[in-house]
Amino acid sequence: MSENQVLIREISLGGRTLTLETGRMAKQASGAVLVTYGETVVLVTATVAKNTRDIDFFPLTVDYEERLYAVGKIPGGFIKREGRPSEKAILSGRLIDRPIRPLFPKHMRNEVQVVATVMSVDQDNAPEIAAMIGASAALHISKIPLKKPIGGVIVGRVDGQFVINPMVRQAENSDMHLVVAGTDDAVMMVEAGAKEVPESEMLEGIMYGHEKVKEIVKFIEDFRTEALGMGLAFEKMEIPEPQFDSNMSEAILTIAEEAIREAVLHCSREKLTKKQREVYMDEVMSGLQEKFLEQFPENPKEVTMLIEKAEKKVVRRIITHDKLRIDGRAIDEIRPISVEVGVLPRTHGTGLFTRGQTQILSVATLGSISEEQILDGLGVEESKRYMHHYNFPPFSTGETKPMRSPGRREIGHGALAERALEPMIPPEEVFPYTIRVVSEAIESNGSTSMGSVCGSTLSLMDAGVPLKAPVAGVAMGLIMEEDQFTVLTDIQGLEDHLGDMDFKVAGSANGVTALQMDIKIPGITREVFEQALEQAHRGRMFILGKMLEVLSTPRAEISVHAPAIIRTSIHPDKIRDIIGPGGKIIKKLVEETGADIDIEDDGRVFIAAVDREKGKRALEIIQSITAEVQVGKLYNGKVTRVTDFGCFVEVIPGVMGLPGKEGLVHISQLAFQRVEKTEDIVKEGEVIAVKAIGYDQQGRLKLSKKEAMRDMGLAPAESTSEQPEKRERRPFSRPKATKE
């Protein structure tokens, strides 16, 4: 790489300028590109190891590194530096990984690492899109053998018009968030969240995005061409194909294909379960292994690879040509479905969803508004009321593995199921709860993420959450053989492993709420998309029907074990009265009632308590603390002090040892007749009726017993009649003395 030359090129993307630069930073990486999009800046590097590894998979790692200095923040906590990647960072890394992985040579075993370091963030220009384009460019100018570059965009739709890479204000009004990545001739990856958008319109969005992707791919191709001429790009390294002895290959494939075909057809005819099929197929495969190792003892690795190649070829050919599946189902048939709700006694809502040998237990928990998740990363600061977490324990597949914290796959599956239900969650004004759903994959044979969507819907409805509409999901598969393809509905584990696509579609009866597509081939066409979406719609409607047979609408009441939330509003100026000095009053209120109390800046108050009576008590206390005495209103108040000039009456009692609201009944307002001594009319501790008649210049409350009696019809007759108008008082003058 040249030490002195720098290549900078730009393209218009979504009405803003995107710039690629190489030759200035990170020159020791195999490929490095600095991407600038608006004021978003991401450095993307691609590095390849010199030596191959003795493994049976391609070791690709994509790391998306968020730096808080990118938005002018210092990390919180004691350490004051970035720690583990956030959930957003993990999802962004997966977003880059998925479209590029199928474009590497099938037999590549050199480790490749792509690192996207987010250095500056402008909220209107998504750093994950800049990182995806940068990863493609960095790989393409390097010696790493990516078959062809990719491009990626976000497609939104505002007022019926598609928008490329919508800005924050546009995204707020968009009914879809569709990430499309692909090459110049095919779509490689789709990730979407939507507000019940019909399949046909989602497809148009995908195709619209792909047209812009083609422009980005051409831009990266031209960037590499210029970089080659400047010594800033390199020729691709060669990855040799594994070579087999032709005699050995022919002997193994001929016999193995026939034996495996008979075994697969037997499994299909008998409709064996996953475990039964695994036992049966293991016997067949082990028998073939032993037979060929006796014949070719010096090539154990090659023997295994050829037998696996035969299995993949046979299973795929049976699906595409015979239209048979290994479990005996039709191409568009869904496995048997079982639905249960209310499974666990003390939880707020549960749904047990079983589809074939995939089983998900989803549990919904309702909490107070204060329990919502605060998202404090590189994006716009916001909070999340609905959370979905997905767990995949090893026993779900009958395996033993260490139990660790959630990995990238679990985080990705959880986010997909969360996205599918998010548009259906009622707003805070309708249902003022924080909601968390945990989906436990307790049995797995494919499509646990879509099972989690179904389980989540059931658990939320069981918890009494008034969803806008129930949601279900189904995973579609694809077998592409030469010029023909077969789309499979509700794929299981083996079909996912041996197939070319995992296309997950979730939504309501009205439209799609989430999409995710992963493929293992260099892209798919519009025709494949159309058929997959059409089959997915039919499958989703079938699954929804099964779910609604068990629970057709959300329960009318939330669980008795869930906190009841009481809402009220106070004047914002009264918030300090509830909080008290140093939070003293609010703490005492929580301790006394056991309720969870949240006060918003605009004066909205949410009281959450499992014990409904304690919640009501907390409401009464808050109303008492914030109550204002209304002028002109009658009150029954307790006489707290008696003085020579009147008495003080508490018209709103104090609570929790706090003083109540009291005012002065002047001695002239105690009775209609003249009062010489206050004690002649009232005694301390006595409860009397008074009327609030106003405030003095110091803001002190003035009360009247006399006016209260008048309003109650207890005034003397003469005092109730209209009084004659008073004559003007003349100055007193003594008559002059006269002389006699």
Curated annotation (Swiss-Prot):
The GO annotation for biological process reads: mRNA catabolic process; RNA processing
A GO MF annotation of the entry reads:
polyribonucleotide nucleotidyltransferase activity
Report keywords, A-Z: Cytoplasm, Magnesium, Metal-binding, Nucleotidyltransferase, RNA-binding, Transferase
> PROSITE patterns recorded for this chain?
KH_TYPE_1, S1
Region Disordered: which residues? Answer: 707-740
Under Pfam families, the record lists:
KH_1, PNPase, RNase_PH, RNase_PH_C, S1
Q: Please give the cofactor(s) recorded in the UniProt entry for this protein.
A: Mg(2+)
Q: Where is Mg(2+) bound in this sequence?
A: D496, D502
The Enzyme Commission number assigned here is 2.7.7.8
Domain KH residues, every copy: 563-622
Q: What is its main location?
A: cytoplasm
User: Where does it live in the cell?
Assistant: Cytoplasm
Similarity comment text for this entry: Belongs to the polyribonucleotide nucleotidyltransferase family.
Task: State the protein's purpose.
Answer: Involved in mRNA degradation. Catalyzes the phosphorolysis of single-stranded polyribonucleotides processively in the 3'- to 5'-direction.
What name does the UniProt record give this protein? Polyribonucleotide nucleotidyltransferase
Source organism? Desulforamulus reducens (strain ATCC BAA-1160 / DSM 100696 / MI-1) (Desulfotomaculum reducens)
Q: What is the lineage of its organism?
A: Bacteria, Bacillati, Bacillota, Clostridia, Eubacteriales
Give the gene that encodes this protein. Answer: pnp
